C-alpha cells in the first residue's frame, strides 16, 4: 500500500518522527538522504520525505503488505502524527 501526505514540516523533521515512530517497533533496514526503511515480522515500511514547491514536504509511506494489515495501521498512524506535529490542535481519531 502507498499513502501520501503534504505537510509544512521540513523533510528532516519528518524523518526524525519516522525514526521515533517506527524505530521502537521495527528494525532499521535502509537509510538514504530523504528516505528511511524499517522492517520486522509484520512487514516492511519505507518513508520518503522530499521538498515540494514552496514550503511544503511531500511524505510518502509505502508498505509491502495489503491494506488494513498491522504495518498499514502503523503507517496511517504515523501520517496522523505528522499532521498533529504540524498542527497541534489536530485530533487523531482513527482506530489505528
Name what the model sees in each region.
Residues 41-96:
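Beta-strand/loop substructures that line and gate deep hydrophobic ligand-binding cavities in soluble
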Residues 26, 38-41:
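Hydrophobic/basic alpha-helical segments enriched in Actinobacteria
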Residues 1-28:
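Terminal, regulation- and interaction-focused segments at domain boundaries
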Amino acid at each position: 500500500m502507498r499513502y501520501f501526505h503534504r505537510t509544512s514540516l521540513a523533510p528532516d523533521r519528518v524523518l526524525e518522527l519516522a525514526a521515533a515512530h517506527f524505530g521502537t517497533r521495527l528494525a532499521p533496514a535502509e537509510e538514504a538522504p530523504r528516505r528511511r526503511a524499517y522492517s520486522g515480522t509484520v512487514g516492511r515500511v519505507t518513508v520518503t520525505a522530499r521538498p515540494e514547491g514552496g514550503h511544503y514536504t511531500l511524505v510518502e509511506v509505502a508498505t509491502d503488505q495489503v491494506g488494513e494489515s498491522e504495518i498499514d495501521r502503523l503507517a496511517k498512524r504515523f501520517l496522523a502524527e505528522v499532521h498533529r506535529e504540524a498542527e497541534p490542535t489536530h485530533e487523531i481519531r482513527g482506530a489505528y
